[in-house]
């Protein structure tokens, strides 16, 4: 074997350090061995994170239920079918859904109502932190309000296309989240930080691939990267140093579909029709379930990875019916036991799984029904126009019953009129 040339031996240590610090890089292309791993993150000088620097807390924010929870309840918006929407609140103790408004005899249809959102603010995302509610509008604005909806103020105006992308992180003084910014065929992901005292928003890092927040640990955010060539990696991003350490890389992610948490990646493996779990830092995955009734074209929806359980749904053709047959699976990751039924709901005639929207100590708030309702729209001439659309119903279910597939809910009563 030839000895390394003196030039190679004299590579500066600083360059090696940069490569290590940004090790969560895009795998090299198999058809071009000369292409080396390069950081996908845009390297920049670390910015100062202000505040007490407390351990991070993960704030869930799902695509189907873009809301937020506090210790006492859950917030989200509802579409009215008109040029505005309303903020509603589900109170855990009274088990009722109400408008976020305390005014007596309020119609909830005018801007003086604390639940009212005009068309430019409709259907955004929320984050509840301490004694405030933060609303992320689709037009790029961020609004702060009290938990009862009062004292609303606009604290930031950004690019209209910079949409909130699922989970957030919170450290007592700052909010962290991923913004996705489409530009033609390319989408850029930005990890940003908003200081909740001065409302200063800073970009910590930007990526050329799709990035999501999967978990938090101390002062680090676990990021899941998915690249255009369908490879993926997982890294821990220190919010203070703005350095990311790669903890897992998968060059065959195109044949897998799964979820990441703090310690593991649980996924459906299309190559051998199995469910596998890989613990970060270990070499070989653990097979949890074999011989799934599926093929390479079978659509699969991953439901949950939380409380040591992994849940997913297999969709199957249903003859000439437009609705598909759903098979639900839940795996206890501590015992390996599996049940083939999650709690189910009626989605306007089609069965679907009950989605978790809020997590209490011993129970979940779930979307336990989707009904077709009639929306009433008041036109400019005073006439009322009707249209039909979906409306979610909610219920509480014990965690034990949820993971056993027992559909025993306590229904949330609704004071919201459409």
Question: What residue ranges belong to the model's regions?
Answer:
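C-terminal motif of bacterial Sec signal peptides marking the signal peptidase cleavage site
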Residues: 20-23
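Generic beta-strand structural signal
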Residues: 69, 79, 92, 128, ...
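Residue position within the beta-strands of beta-propeller blades
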Residues: 74-78, 135-136, 176-179, 222-225, ...
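Positively charged n-region of N-terminal signal peptides that target proteins for export
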Residues: 1-8, 15
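Surface-exposed loop/turn elements that mediate protein-protein interactions on large endomembrane-trafficking
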Residues: 26, 37-59, 83-112, 141-157, ...
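A generic tandem-repeat structural signature
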Residues: 123-197
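Repeated scaffold domains used in trafficking and secretory/extracellular systems
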Residues: 55-71, 109-128, 161-172, 206-218, ...
């Amino acid at each position: 074997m030839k000895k390394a040339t003196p030039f190679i031996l004299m590579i500066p240590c600083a360059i090696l350090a940069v490569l290590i610090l940004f090790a969560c890089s895009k795998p090299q292309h198999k058809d071009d061995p000369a292409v080396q791993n390069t950081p996908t993150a845009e390297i920049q000088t670390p910015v100062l994170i202000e505040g007490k620097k407390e351990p991070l807390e993960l704030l869930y924010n799902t695509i189907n239920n873009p809301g937020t929870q506090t210790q006492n309840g859950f917030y989200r918006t509802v579409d009215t079918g008109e040029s505005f929407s309303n903020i509603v609140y589900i109170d855990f103790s009274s088990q009722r859904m109400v408008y976020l408004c305390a005014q007596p005899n309020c119609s909830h249809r005018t801007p003086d109502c604390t639940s009212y959102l005009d068309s430019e603010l409709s259907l955004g995302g929320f984050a509840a932190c301490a004694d405030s509610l933060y609303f992320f509008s689709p037009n790029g604005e961020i609004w702060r309000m009290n938990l009862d909806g009062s004292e609303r103020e606009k604290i930031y105006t950004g690019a209209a296309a910079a949409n909130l992308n699922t989970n957030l992180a919170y450290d007592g003084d700052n909010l962290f989240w991923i913004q996705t910014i489409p530009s033609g065929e390319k989408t850029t992901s930005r990890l940003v930080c908003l200081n909740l005292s001065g409302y200063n928003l800073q970009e910590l890092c930007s990526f050329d691939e799709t990035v999501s927040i999967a978990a938090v640990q101390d002062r680090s955010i676990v990021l899941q990267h998915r690249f255009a060539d369908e490879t993926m990696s997982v890294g821990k991003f220190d919010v203070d140093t703005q350095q990311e350490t790669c903890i897992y890389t998968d060059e065959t992610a195109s044949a897998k579909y799964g979820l990441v948490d703090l310690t593991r990646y649980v996924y459906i493996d299309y190559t051998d029709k199995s469910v596998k779990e890989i613990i970060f830092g270990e070499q070989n995955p653990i097979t949890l379930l074999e011989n799934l009734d599926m093929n390479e074209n079978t659509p699969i929806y991953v439901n949950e990875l939380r409380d040591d359980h992994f849940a997913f749904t297999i969709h199957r053709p249903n003859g000439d019916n437009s609705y598909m047959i759903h098979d639900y699976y839940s795996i206890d990751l501590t015992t390996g036991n599996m049940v083939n039924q999650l709690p189910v709901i009626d989605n306007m005639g089609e069965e679907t799984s009950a989605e978790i929207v809020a997590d209490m100590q011993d129970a979940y708030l779930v979307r336990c029904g989707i009904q077709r309702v009639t929306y009433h729209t008041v036109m400019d001439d005073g006439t009322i126009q009707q249209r039909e659309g979906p409306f979610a119903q909610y219920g509480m279910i014990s965690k034990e019953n949820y993971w056993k597939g027992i559909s025993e809910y306590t229904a949330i009563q609704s004071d919201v009129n459409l």
